Each structure stands twice: as structure tokens, then as C-alpha cells.
Amino acid sequence: MLRFDFPGVSIGAAHYEEGPTGATVIHIPAGARTAVDARGGAVGLSGGYDFNHAICLAGGAGYGLEAGAGVSGALLERLEYRTGFAELQLVSSAVIYDFSARSTAVYPDKALGRAALEFAVPGEFPQGRAGAGMSASAGKVDWDRTEITGQGAAFRRLGDVRILAVVVPNPVGVIVDRAGTVVRGNYDAQTGVRRHPVFDYQEAFAEQVPPVTEAGNTTISAIVTNVRMSPVELNQFAKQVHSSMHRGIQPFHTDMDGDTLFAVTTDEIDLPTTPGSSRGRLSVNATALGAIASEVMWDAVLEAGK
């Protein structure tokens, strides 16, 4: 269990044991501006709004997007069904294809999304096999060498700056630590060795045979901060953090993946500025924040791979 100090942000997770599959909800009752960066060949995304009251991450591939509808309905119920334009509760969702790791057709539905929201509490995140990470896996060059992952999170506070990273890694690639060691995925049980998929691909090309890779892979994530950024800065922040995840997941953003990152700001604090801290639309502050957030996200990826 990760404990974090981020007022106004609650997280809940729920799952169906008979799946197993689940959903994870990041609830920000006041709402927060959001940038979405989606890449890869098979993105599963709904909403994609630039302002959200909740982000729903779920298993179940496209069917699991129903969980987000459950979150939306529950928020409407909490508003006693008021539908004024200014009161609309916006929910964006992203899903992973987790059917590879299980033999059932169970998927996160409206009831499960609603349950994840009901379980949302401030300051706590269930790590590992919980929520959307129930049947996540990594290193799917050959299914016999695939390993189960989970969901991971990391938090960092620097003065008034708060950064929370949440991730459900379900990639074709492997999880790699800062020493360059493969720590999850593509595991040979006979030798006890995990190896980088590039070696499998090189061997296939050398033998003039098509490389083997399992279909149905996705990594979904969210990076939440309280630092105010312009729309341009927030979009670049999302791209910077998402791109940095290539270090911890290799390969990443492939045609066999469908990766989505939500960058969320609660717009509560401003970083100090000087005449030299920006160049037109370019911001040194946002770049520095993105660099720090990228490390927090790598920590979250490693937590998910434990």
C-alpha cells in the first residue's frame, strides 16, 4: 500500500475475483485540467476530456470502458441528478487487454466502476495485483515467458510541489530498472534468466523467421500534480513523461501496444519565475517538473513489476 499526501485526490480499486480483472479510479471532486497522450497500435480510450472529475483505469479491453460509465453514473447520482452544464461530471477512461492472462470473458462493468469509486479514499493506493492491475502482464515475446505485473504508484513532495504517478503496465516489452536489468517479463523458468526482447528479435532475423510477439498489450497511466501549467505546457508535460517511460518499459509504444497517459493538474500552486524561465511558449519550469515526474513514474513502473 502506498500512502501519499495529496489533498483533493482520492483513489479506489475494485475487482472481480472470477475474472480476475478490475478497475482503479482516481477521483478529484473539484475537477482538474487534463492532457491526454495516447500512442501505439491499439489504444483503448474514452472521454479524453481536457477537464475531468475522475480517471478510470480498467481491464477488459474495450468492454472494460463500461466501468468508466459506471463512475460517471455514480457521480451523477451524488449530484442528485442535477444536469446543469457547469455541474457535469466528466470521466475519462483507458483500458488494458488483460484476457491473455486469464480464461474468462469477465470484464469491468458499470457496477465495478461504481464500486471502485465507492472505495476511493484520500492518501492510499493499493499496489500490485489490485484494481486494473489484476491480470496485467509483461514480456510477451513468448507467452510461456510472460510474467504477471500489477498496478503501481509513487509519490514525491518537494516543498509545496506534489507529484503522484499511477501506472498499469501490460506491455509486450519488459520492465527494466535503472541499472538496465530486466526485472519483470520474458522469464525463462528453466534457466532462471530474464532477457531483453531485442535478443529474441535479433535471433529471429538472423534465422530469417518472423519474430514472435503476443498481441493484446497496453500500458495505461496517470501523472497528477498540483502545479499550474498553461495548456501548451500541460500537453508537453504529458508527452515528456510518457516518452520517458521507454526507459522502464522496453520496447514501448509499439504497434502491438496501445498506451495512454493522463497528465492532470489541480492548478493549486505556481512555480517561481524569472525573465529567463521561459522562452515564448517554452517553459523551463514545466521541463524541470516533467523531468522529476518522469523519475516518479519510473518508480511507479518498478513498483508494479515487483
Swiss-Prot record:
Range of residues in the leader sequence: none
Molecular function GO terms recorded: aminopeptidase activity
SUPFAM superfamilies named among the record's database cross-references: DmpA/ArgJ-like (SSF56266)
Any one Pfam family match given in the protein's UniProt record, by short name: Peptidase_S58
Other facts noted in the record for this chain: This gene may not be expressed. The 25 amino acid residues corresponding to the N-terminal region of NylC are replaced with 76 residues derived from non-coding regions. No potent initiation codons are found within the replaced region of nylC'.
Assigned protein family: Belongs to the peptidase S58 family.
Protein name as annotated: Putative NylC-analogous protein
